[in-house]
């Protein structure tokens, strides 16, 4: 990667770089037009109700949109294209913000997928849900890996004053395919091969580091935390109502506050959870928060039941 300073800060890739192919969408295009976080709390809409919004609304409905995987992989390929350009700190910071937006979008997309009513076609929808969750986990692993690489680049080549260094850690780096067509319905995890590399943190003086506030805006983290707290409260209410027996109303219940522990969930932007769960995905150990872990256990259980029923019918 060449790291010569660029003077033009208006574009993502720079004037000295070759243009991205026509089949790849730029980061700004995808994030601004397809990953609009202001609309992620609303229900999926159809083309009949939003004819003036082109096809951006359809991207929020993973059940009906066949182009979702193509959009996401093109976004990831466009992010990778940044590190082939001369180093520019503004472009790197913008890319980190876009990655954070993409992580929030995927988490909200998972929530929308789970909230849809799928009783009419439970067999097919459970298979689609399992494939969709596996795709999202793979995408989040790649986003976390590339975001760490951008942070290390900024540490190594920027001259700004800060207060904190990023520690060394091993980062799994999936290798994405150069192009994905709309007709490709295979699982994303079958197209991606994982490679583990060791990222070395550079030697930096105490006066030559950067702050977390510039890389991870506090406002965005607060929004993510509010989303996680809301999901946890709704889940706890459902558990209390389903586990209540006829004798429970005579005994007063003591509700204890959950002790949150810091961590990093690969499925959602959650950084605190009362229970962190470990899973193996593509031969790699990943960590999920309690809510995402429960969803993954439930999905795996139903998938096994479906496979057993298919085996017995034969």
Curated annotation (Swiss-Prot):
InterPro entries reported in the protein's UniProt record: Znf_NHR/GATA (IPR013088)
Domain of life: Eukaryota
GO molecular function: zinc ion binding
GO BP, sorted A to Z: regulation of DNA-templated transcription
Protein name (Swiss-Prot/TrEMBL): GATA zinc finger domain-containing protein 19
Organism per entry: Dictyostelium discoideum
